[in-house]
Protein backbone atom coordinates (compact mmCIF):
# COMPACT_ATOMS: atom_id res chain seq x y z
CA UNK A 1 0.00 0.00 0.00
CA UNK A 2 1.41 3.39 -1.03
CA UNK A 3 0.37 6.37 1.10
CA UNK A 4 0.27 9.79 -0.57
CA UNK A 5 -0.35 13.14 1.08
CA UNK A 6 -3.12 15.00 -0.78
CA UNK A 7 -2.82 18.77 -0.66
CA UNK A 8 -5.61 20.92 -2.13
CA UNK A 9 -4.74 24.56 -2.84
CA UNK A 10 -7.64 27.00 -3.13
CA UNK A 11 -6.41 30.16 -4.80
CA UNK A 12 -9.51 32.05 -5.97
CA UNK A 13 -13.11 33.05 -5.33
CA UNK A 14 -14.41 30.73 -8.04
CA UNK A 15 -12.25 27.85 -6.87
CA UNK A 16 -13.73 28.22 -3.39
CA UNK A 17 -17.33 28.74 -4.53
CA UNK A 18 -17.46 26.07 -7.25
CA UNK A 19 -14.44 23.79 -6.97
CA UNK A 20 -14.37 23.06 -3.24
CA UNK A 21 -17.98 21.77 -2.92
CA UNK A 22 -17.42 19.47 -5.89
CA UNK A 23 -14.19 18.16 -4.40
CA UNK A 24 -15.81 17.64 -0.99
CA UNK A 25 -18.54 15.53 -2.55
CA UNK A 26 -16.04 13.45 -4.52
CA UNK A 27 -13.68 12.90 -1.60
CA UNK A 28 -16.61 11.83 0.57
CA UNK A 29 -17.70 9.27 -2.04
CA UNK A 30 -14.21 7.81 -2.11
CA UNK A 31 -13.76 8.00 1.69
CA UNK A 32 -10.67 10.20 1.35
CA UNK A 33 -9.48 12.93 3.70
CA UNK A 34 -7.11 15.65 2.50
CA UNK A 35 -5.48 18.93 3.53
CA UNK A 36 -7.19 22.06 2.17
CA UNK A 37 -5.20 25.30 2.08
CA UNK A 38 -7.41 28.36 1.62
CA UNK A 39 -6.71 31.86 0.32
CA UNK A 40 -9.05 34.09 2.33
CA UNK A 41 -8.37 37.70 1.28
CA UNK A 42 -8.96 39.55 -2.01
CA UNK A 43 -8.98 37.59 -5.27
CA UNK A 44 -6.48 39.54 -7.36
CA UNK A 45 -5.28 36.62 -9.48
CA UNK A 46 -5.97 38.48 -12.73
CA UNK A 47 -3.07 40.78 -11.93
CA UNK A 48 -0.76 37.94 -12.97
CA UNK A 49 -1.57 38.84 -16.60
CA UNK A 50 1.40 41.19 -16.71
CA UNK A 51 3.60 38.08 -16.44
CA UNK A 52 2.58 37.19 -20.02
CA UNK A 53 5.57 39.28 -21.10
CA UNK A 54 7.75 36.53 -19.61
CA UNK A 55 8.20 33.75 -22.21
CA UNK A 56 8.10 30.87 -19.70
CA UNK A 57 4.82 32.05 -18.16
CA UNK A 58 3.29 32.78 -21.57
CA UNK A 59 4.20 29.28 -22.78
CA UNK A 60 2.67 27.74 -19.64
CA UNK A 61 -0.58 29.64 -20.21
CA UNK A 62 -0.71 28.59 -23.86
CA UNK A 63 0.06 24.88 -23.38
CA UNK A 64 -2.44 24.58 -20.51
CA UNK A 65 -5.14 26.45 -22.49
CA UNK A 66 -5.56 28.77 -19.51
CA UNK A 67 -8.76 30.50 -20.67
CA UNK A 68 -10.63 27.18 -20.79
CA UNK A 69 -8.84 25.79 -17.75
CA UNK A 70 -9.43 28.67 -15.33
CA UNK A 71 -12.17 30.78 -16.94
CA UNK A 72 -12.06 34.50 -17.69
CA UNK A 73 -13.49 35.42 -14.27
CA UNK A 74 -10.30 34.06 -12.67
CA UNK A 75 -7.93 35.41 -15.32
CA UNK A 76 -9.34 38.95 -14.96
CA UNK A 77 -10.06 38.99 -11.20
CA UNK A 78 -8.79 42.14 -9.51
CA UNK A 79 -7.72 43.88 -12.73
CA UNK A 80 -10.36 46.43 -13.75
CA UNK A 81 -12.10 46.20 -10.36
CA UNK A 82 -11.19 45.44 -6.76
CA UNK A 83 -10.79 41.76 -6.04
CA UNK A 84 -13.62 40.16 -4.07
CA UNK A 85 -12.73 38.94 -0.58
CA UNK A 86 -12.80 35.16 -0.72
CA UNK A 87 -13.04 33.91 2.85
CA UNK A 88 -15.96 35.76 4.37
CA UNK A 89 -18.10 35.44 1.23
CA UNK A 90 -17.56 31.67 1.22
CA UNK A 91 -17.40 31.03 4.95
CA UNK A 92 -20.05 28.29 4.90
CA UNK A 93 -18.10 26.32 2.29
CA UNK A 94 -14.86 26.61 4.25
CA UNK A 95 -16.62 25.51 7.45
CA UNK A 96 -18.07 22.52 5.61
CA UNK A 97 -14.56 21.52 4.50
CA UNK A 98 -13.33 21.85 8.08
CA UNK A 99 -15.88 19.27 9.29
CA UNK A 100 -14.10 16.43 7.51
CA UNK A 101 -10.67 17.64 6.39
CA UNK A 102 -7.51 19.32 7.63
CA UNK A 103 -7.64 23.09 7.06
CA UNK A 104 -4.65 25.38 6.63
CA UNK A 105 -3.80 28.86 5.41
CA UNK A 106 -2.64 29.30 1.84
CA UNK A 107 -2.55 33.09 1.74
CA UNK A 108 -4.26 36.31 2.65
CA UNK A 109 -3.72 37.70 -0.88
CA UNK A 110 -2.39 34.94 -3.16
CA UNK A 111 -1.24 37.35 -5.88
CA UNK A 112 0.54 39.67 -3.44
CA UNK A 113 2.41 36.81 -1.78
CA UNK A 114 3.46 35.18 -5.02
CA UNK A 115 4.54 38.50 -6.55
CA UNK A 116 6.04 40.47 -3.67
CA UNK A 117 6.82 38.28 -0.65
CA UNK A 118 10.35 37.59 -1.86
CA UNK A 119 11.15 41.27 -1.23
CA UNK A 120 9.28 41.72 2.05
CA UNK A 121 11.06 42.12 5.39
CA UNK A 122 10.28 39.70 8.18
CA UNK A 123 7.75 41.94 9.93
CA UNK A 124 5.75 42.36 6.73
CA UNK A 125 5.76 38.58 6.27
CA UNK A 126 4.60 38.05 9.86
CA UNK A 127 1.83 40.65 9.52
CA UNK A 128 0.55 39.13 6.28
CA UNK A 129 0.49 35.59 7.67
CA UNK A 130 -1.19 36.80 10.87
CA UNK A 131 -3.91 38.56 8.89
CA UNK A 132 -4.74 35.42 6.93
CA UNK A 133 -4.67 33.16 9.99
CA UNK A 134 -6.93 35.52 11.93
CA UNK A 135 -9.59 35.52 9.19
CA UNK A 136 -9.42 31.75 8.65
CA UNK A 137 -9.66 31.04 12.38
CA UNK A 138 -12.68 33.33 12.68
CA UNK A 139 -14.35 31.39 9.86
CA UNK A 140 -13.77 27.86 11.16
CA UNK A 141 -14.00 28.75 14.84
CA UNK A 142 -10.82 26.98 15.89
CA UNK A 143 -7.04 27.42 15.70
CA UNK A 144 -5.32 26.74 12.38
CA UNK A 145 -2.48 24.24 12.73
CA UNK A 146 -0.81 24.31 9.31
CA UNK A 147 -0.02 26.48 6.31
CA UNK A 148 1.33 26.35 2.76
CA UNK A 149 2.55 29.52 1.07
CA UNK A 150 1.21 30.61 -2.31
CA UNK A 151 3.25 29.46 -5.29
CA UNK A 152 5.85 27.79 -3.03
CA UNK A 153 7.43 31.24 -2.64
CA UNK A 154 9.41 30.52 0.49
CA UNK A 155 12.97 30.71 1.77
CA UNK A 156 14.64 30.75 5.17
CA UNK A 157 13.21 34.20 5.95
CA UNK A 158 9.69 32.77 5.54
CA UNK A 159 10.65 29.82 7.74
CA UNK A 160 11.76 32.22 10.48
CA UNK A 161 8.60 34.33 10.12
CA UNK A 162 6.34 31.32 10.55
CA UNK A 163 7.99 30.37 13.84
CA UNK A 164 5.93 33.14 15.47
CA UNK A 165 2.76 31.10 14.99
CA UNK A 166 3.70 27.72 16.51
CA UNK A 167 1.98 25.69 13.80
CA UNK A 168 2.12 21.91 13.70
CA UNK A 169 3.68 21.87 10.23
CA UNK A 170 4.12 23.91 7.06
CA UNK A 171 4.20 22.82 3.42
CA UNK A 172 6.12 25.65 1.79
CA UNK A 173 8.53 24.02 -0.62
CA UNK A 174 9.27 21.28 -3.12
CA UNK A 175 11.40 18.36 -2.05
CA UNK A 176 11.49 14.65 -1.26
CA UNK A 177 10.49 14.07 2.37
CA UNK A 178 9.43 15.84 5.60
CA UNK A 179 12.23 17.62 7.43
CA UNK A 180 13.06 20.03 10.26
CA UNK A 181 14.28 23.38 8.93
CA UNK A 182 17.35 24.67 10.72
CA UNK A 183 16.87 28.17 12.16
CA UNK A 184 19.40 30.99 12.52
CA UNK A 185 19.58 30.18 16.23
CA UNK A 186 20.82 26.68 15.40
CA UNK A 187 17.60 25.11 16.66
CA UNK A 188 15.20 23.24 14.41
CA UNK A 189 11.90 24.82 13.40
CA UNK A 190 8.38 23.74 12.58
CA UNK A 191 8.41 20.62 10.37
CA UNK A 192 8.09 21.11 6.63
CA UNK A 193 6.22 18.62 4.44
CA UNK A 194 7.36 19.33 0.87
CA UNK A 195 5.38 18.62 -2.26
CA UNK A 196 7.26 15.90 -4.13
CA UNK A 197 5.19 15.42 -7.30
CA UNK A 198 4.60 17.75 -10.27
CA UNK A 199 1.27 19.53 -10.57
CA UNK A 200 -1.01 19.13 -13.60
CA UNK A 201 -0.10 22.49 -15.13
CA UNK A 202 3.65 21.88 -14.80
CA UNK A 203 3.75 18.87 -17.10
CA UNK A 204 0.66 18.77 -19.35
CA UNK A 205 1.61 19.98 -22.82
CA UNK A 206 5.30 19.77 -21.95
CA UNK A 207 5.99 16.19 -20.85
CA UNK A 208 2.66 14.46 -21.28
CA UNK A 209 -0.68 14.80 -23.06
CA UNK A 210 -3.81 15.54 -21.04
CA UNK A 211 -5.27 12.09 -21.74
CA UNK A 212 -2.10 10.37 -20.49
CA UNK A 213 -1.56 12.44 -17.35
CA UNK A 214 -3.21 10.13 -14.80
CA UNK A 215 -1.22 7.09 -15.89
CA UNK A 216 1.97 9.15 -15.94
CA UNK A 217 1.32 10.49 -12.43
CA UNK A 218 0.46 7.10 -10.94
CA UNK A 219 3.70 5.71 -12.33
CA UNK A 220 5.60 8.59 -10.69
CA UNK A 221 3.88 7.90 -7.37
CA UNK A 222 4.73 4.20 -7.45
CA UNK A 223 8.38 5.03 -8.24
CA UNK A 224 8.66 7.72 -5.54
CA UNK A 225 11.28 6.66 -2.98
CA UNK A 226 10.60 9.54 -0.61
CA UNK A 227 7.31 10.58 1.00
CA UNK A 228 4.89 11.29 -1.87
CA UNK A 229 2.86 14.50 -1.65
CA UNK A 230 0.60 15.60 -4.49
CA UNK A 231 -1.02 19.02 -4.95
CA UNK A 232 -4.25 19.65 -6.82
CA UNK A 233 -6.02 22.98 -7.29
CA UNK A 234 -9.71 23.65 -6.69
CA UNK A 235 -9.66 25.74 -9.88
CA UNK A 236 -8.41 22.80 -12.00
CA UNK A 237 -9.31 19.42 -10.51
CA UNK A 238 -12.40 20.91 -8.87
CA UNK A 239 -13.65 22.57 -12.06
CA UNK A 240 -12.56 21.96 -15.68
CA UNK A 241 -10.72 18.68 -14.99
CA UNK A 242 -12.86 17.26 -12.21
CA UNK A 243 -13.82 14.10 -14.09
CA UNK A 244 -10.14 13.45 -14.76
CA UNK A 245 -9.50 13.73 -11.02
CA UNK A 246 -12.30 11.26 -10.30
CA UNK A 247 -10.67 8.86 -12.75
CA UNK A 248 -7.33 9.36 -10.98
CA UNK A 249 -8.85 8.38 -7.63
CA UNK A 250 -10.41 5.23 -9.09
CA UNK A 251 -7.21 4.16 -10.79
CA UNK A 252 -5.13 4.93 -7.70
CA UNK A 253 -7.35 2.68 -5.57
CA UNK A 254 -6.83 -0.18 -8.02
CA UNK A 255 -3.06 0.34 -7.74
CA UNK A 256 -3.14 0.20 -3.94
CA UNK A 257 -2.52 3.95 -3.55
CA UNK A 258 -4.27 5.72 -0.67
CA UNK A 259 -4.49 9.47 -0.06
CA UNK A 260 -4.33 11.17 3.33
CA UNK A 261 -3.99 14.59 5.02
CA UNK A 262 -0.41 15.81 5.16
CA UNK A 263 -0.27 15.63 8.96
CA UNK A 264 -0.52 11.83 8.75
CA UNK A 265 2.90 11.80 7.10
CA UNK A 266 4.62 13.16 10.21
CA UNK A 267 6.46 10.70 12.47
CA UNK A 268 5.56 10.30 16.14
CA UNK A 269 8.51 12.49 17.15
CA UNK A 270 10.17 15.35 15.28
CA UNK A 271 13.60 13.98 16.17
CA UNK A 272 13.05 11.31 13.53
CA UNK A 273 13.05 13.97 10.80
CA UNK A 274 16.26 15.01 9.01
CA UNK A 275 17.53 18.57 9.18
CA UNK A 276 17.25 20.83 6.16
CA UNK A 277 16.66 24.32 4.91
CA UNK A 278 14.63 26.02 2.20
CA UNK A 279 16.58 27.65 -0.61
CA UNK A 280 15.38 29.44 -3.73
CA UNK A 281 15.46 27.26 -6.83
CA UNK A 282 13.67 26.47 -10.07
CA UNK A 283 11.78 23.50 -11.47
CA UNK A 284 10.75 22.70 -15.01
CA UNK A 285 7.29 23.87 -15.98
CA UNK A 286 6.97 26.65 -13.40
CA UNK A 287 7.92 30.27 -14.03
CA UNK A 288 10.07 32.06 -11.48
CA UNK A 289 11.76 30.88 -8.31
CA UNK A 290 10.27 28.70 -5.60
CA UNK A 291 11.37 27.17 -2.32
CA UNK A 292 13.30 23.91 -2.56
CA UNK A 293 14.39 21.50 0.18
CA UNK A 294 18.11 21.30 0.81
CA UNK A 295 19.77 18.90 3.22
CA UNK A 296 21.87 20.23 6.08
CA UNK A 297 24.95 18.32 7.15
CA UNK A 298 25.17 17.44 10.84
CA UNK A 299 28.69 18.87 10.80
CA UNK A 300 27.40 22.36 9.95
Swiss-Prot record:
GO terms for cellular component: membrane. Its EC number is 3.5.1.n3. Residues 2-260 form the NodB homology domain. Pfam families: Polysacc_deac_1. HAMAP family: ArnD (MF_01870). It comes from the Bacteria. One of its GO terms (molecular function) is hydrolase activity, acting on carbon-nitrogen (but not peptide) bonds, in linear amides. Keywords: Antibiotic resistance, Hydrolase, Lipid A biosynthesis, Lipid biosynthesis, Lipid metabolism, Lipopolysaccharide biosynthesis. InterPro entries: ArnD, Glyco_hydro/deAcase_b/a-brl, NODB_dom, Polysacc_deacetylase_ArnD. CDD domains: CE4_ArnD (cd10939). Pathway: Glycolipid biosynthesis; 4-amino-4-deoxy-alpha-L-arabinose undecaprenyl phosphate biosynthesis; 4-amino-4-deoxy-alpha-L-arabinose undecaprenyl phosphate from UDP-4-deoxy-4-formamido-beta-L-arabinose and undecaprenyl phosphate: step 2/2; Bacterial outer membrane biogenesis; lipopolysaccharide biosynthesis. Catalyzes the deformylation of 4-deoxy-4-formamido-L-arabinose-phosphoundecaprenol to 4-amino-4-deoxy-L-arabinose-phosphoundecaprenol. The modified arabinose is attached to lipid A and is required for resistance to polymyxin and cationic antimicrobial peptides. PROSITE patterns: NODB. Belongs to the polysaccharide deacetylase family. ArnD deformylase subfamily. One of its GO terms (biological process) is lipid A biosynthetic process. This is Probable 4-deoxy-4-formamido-L-arabinose-phosphoundecaprenol deformylase ArnD. It catalyses: 4-deoxy-4-formamido-alpha-L-arabinopyranosyl di-trans,octa-cis-undecaprenyl phosphate + H2O = 4-amino-4-deoxy-alpha-L-arabinopyranosyl di-trans,octa-cis-undecaprenyl phosphate + formate. The lineage of its organism: Bacteria, Pseudomonadati, Pseudomonadota, Gammaproteobacteria, Enterobacterales. It comes from Escherichia fergusonii (strain ATCC 35469 / DSM 13698 / CCUG 18766 / IAM 14443 / JCM 21226 / LMG 7866 / NBRC 102419 / NCTC 12128 / CDC 0568-73). It is an enzyme of class 3 (hydrolase).
